[in-house]
A protein has these predicted regions:
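Bacterial N-terminal signal peptides that target proteins for export
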Residues: 1-9
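C-terminal motif of bacterial Sec signal peptides marking the signal peptidase cleavage site
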Residues: 19-22
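Bacterial signal peptide processing site
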Residues: 24-26
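N-terminal lobe/hinge region of extracytoplasmic solute-binding protein
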Residues: 35-85, 205-209
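Sec-exported extracytoplasmic/periplasmic mature domains
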Residues: 65, 69, 96-99, 122-130, ...
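Aromatic- and charge-enriched surface segment that lines or borders ligand/interaction sites
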Residues: 79-136, 167
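Gly/Pro-rich hinge or "lid" segments in bacterial periplasmic/extracellular proteins
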Residues: 163-164, 169-209
Length: 209
């Protein structure tokens, strides 16, 4: 394996530890080394589409829900969720005390809050993002108008009630909506961190020796 692949494996291993710590796991150091055939070129979950990028994002970030070993949808970063009787409102109650953790377990000041999910979905429907996940979540209220620039992003049917309560409002029923929340595009994005890194998301310059 060449040096480039080895370096990528190390980056993925360190970032995987970021996910485990962010999900409120044990304080003990945990690492996972995954050797890949193709180098991930994009670690931005709102735009990742290539198989290697999606696999990396699915292992780097946590979402509201995940599938367990039996294939059932279970809470991940949330404690629980509620669905209205008409199927148009989804309310998620996030776990408290979740934080993003840097490589090698370095602590950060970035807490995972409902606003991170709001910002993530606003990015999905920002025309400049050109997110492939916009079509998957087109049932969200005002998503089409926000995407085509005729409505303010603040009118998108994704809102935070306090730090730990996230609400989705749909314009039409979508019985697959919950399962779509395991997609990378639905994973949280801290606005301050994103702006500070200009969306580079761990990508690095490589110079061969």
């Amino acid at each position: 394996m060449n040096r480039f692949l080895r370096m990528t494996a190390v980056v993925l291993a360190a970032a995987f530890a970021f996910l485990l710590a962010g999900c409120g796991g044990s304080s003990a150091s945990t690492s996972f080394t995954w050797f890949v055939d193709n180098i991930p070129a994009n670690l931005d979950p709102q735009v990742a589409t290539k198989a290697e990028d999606v696999i990396a994002c699915e292992n780097l970030y946590g979402g509201l829900v995940r599938r367990n070993a039996s294939g059932e949808l279970v809470p991940d970063l949330c404690e629980r969720w509620e669905i209205s009787s008409d199927g148009l409102t989804y309310t998620f109650y996030l776990k408290s005390g979740l934080t993003y953790t840097g490589t090698k377990g370095a602590a950060t000041d970035y807490a995972i809050t409902a606003e991170d999910f709001v910002y993530a979905f606003r990015r999905v429907f920002d025309p400049q993002t050109a997110s492939p996940y916009a079509v998957e979540f087109s049932a969200i209220q005002n998503s089409t108008a926000v995407l085509d620039g005729t409505a303010d992003p603040g009118t998108l049917g994704v809102s935070a009630i306090g730090e730990l309560t996230l609400v989705f409002r749909l314009s039409e029923r979508d019985d697959t909506f919950l399962s779509k929340l395991i997609l990378p595009g639905a994973m949280p994005c801290d606005e301050a961190f994103f702006e500070s890194t200009r969306g580079t998301y761990g990508l690095f310059l490589y110079m061969s020796a």
